[in-house]
């Protein structure tokens, strides 16, 4: 994923029962000792109590970088809640990423974490496509949970990811979420590893008219679609009076201001360029 850099990733579980077909975290399976396919196992983490949490004051922690911290198992085991209880009073800036409205259970703790924000992954408004891709809660529940958190004064992010070319309607999702979020993150679909063939097979079966587009992007490396979508979303933002930036997660607008749209389409190119420049230094 092209998620913004944080000081500490935190994942209360190994594995994720949401079983997203495009999950970049599936590489974690090889470290798990499991034979089951990714998405069909979950290991519950236990850890020693955090000592002197205040020493992390000012650091950023991202909860849910390679698992969903509010997958159904959390209702039983409560490891994410246990983590948040330890972080209250630490001074850490906490970001949570989820596809579940179970996060609402922990509003009492999240509201005690200054600067906390909760992101919801939404890459379609089509419930049929959503159910083909993940086993998380329906989209309406995600949007409702986003609103409840935002209404409670907690910063929220609509994470439009992964954007499926020809399928994900970015402006439509922004319209559905703009009254209940502070940030909109945009991340393109990256196909790598074992799930590339699965996703391309799905497109061939369910959306054959898109096969030439997917071949151009994912077999030939053509970036035209993303450049054109960048122009389209920028024009939409200008029409709607929304701030639009690339690869910059530092924007802090007033809570009641319209959401800032952050485009991460070109994050990998920027990282490669930085490495190249660094190599010549």
Regions found by a protein language model. Name each.
Residues 66-68, 99-101, 121-125, 161-163, ...:
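Active-site beta-loop-alpha junctions enriched in small/polar residues
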Residues 1-117, 125-128, 139-143, 150-151:
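Conserved Radical SAM active-site core
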Residues 61, 94-96, 118-120, 156-160, ...:
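Hydrophobic faces of well-ordered beta-strands that scaffold small-molecule active sites
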Residues 86, 109, 148, 152, ...:
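Alpha-helical scaffold elements within enzyme catalytic domains, especially in hydrolases
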Residues 147-168, 219-223:
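Conserved strand-turn element in the central/C-terminal portion of the radical SAM core barrel
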């Amino acid at each position: 994923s092209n998620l913004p850099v944080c000081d500490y990733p935190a994942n209360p579980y190994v594995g994720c029962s949401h079983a997203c077909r495009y999950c970049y975290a599936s590489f974690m399976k090889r470290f798990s000792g499991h034979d089951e396919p990714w998405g069909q196992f979950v290991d519950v983490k236990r850890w020693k109590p955090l000592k002197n949490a205040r020493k992390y004051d000012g650091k950023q922690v991202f909860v849910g970088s390679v698992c969903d911290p509010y997958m159904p198992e959390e209702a039983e085991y409560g490891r994410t809640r246990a983590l948040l209880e330890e972080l209250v009073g630490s001074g850490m800036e906490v970001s949570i990423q989820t596809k579940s409205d179970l996060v609402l259970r922990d509003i009492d703790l999240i509201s005690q974490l200054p600067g906390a924000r909760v992101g919801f992954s939404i890459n379609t408004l089509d419930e049929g496509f959503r159910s083909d891709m993940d086993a998380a809660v329906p989209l309406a529940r995600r949007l409702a949970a986003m609103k409840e958190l935002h209404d409670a004064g907690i910063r929220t992010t609509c994470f439009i990811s992964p954007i499926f070319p020809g399928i994900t309607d970015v402006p439509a999702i922004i319209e559905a979420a703009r009254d209940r979020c502070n940030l909109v993150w945009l991340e393109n679909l990256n196909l790598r590893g074992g799930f590339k063939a699965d996703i391309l097979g799905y497109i061939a079966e369910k959306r054959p008219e898109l096969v030439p587009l997917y071949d151009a992007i994912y077999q030939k490396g053509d970036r035209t679609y993303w450049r054109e979508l960048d122009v389209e979303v920028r024009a939409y933002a200008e029409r709607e009076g929304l701030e639009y930036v690339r690869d910059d997660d530092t924007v802090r607008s007033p809570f009641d201001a319209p959401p800032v749209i952050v485009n991460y389409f070109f994050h990998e190119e920027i990282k490669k360029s930085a490495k190249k420049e660094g190599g010549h230094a």
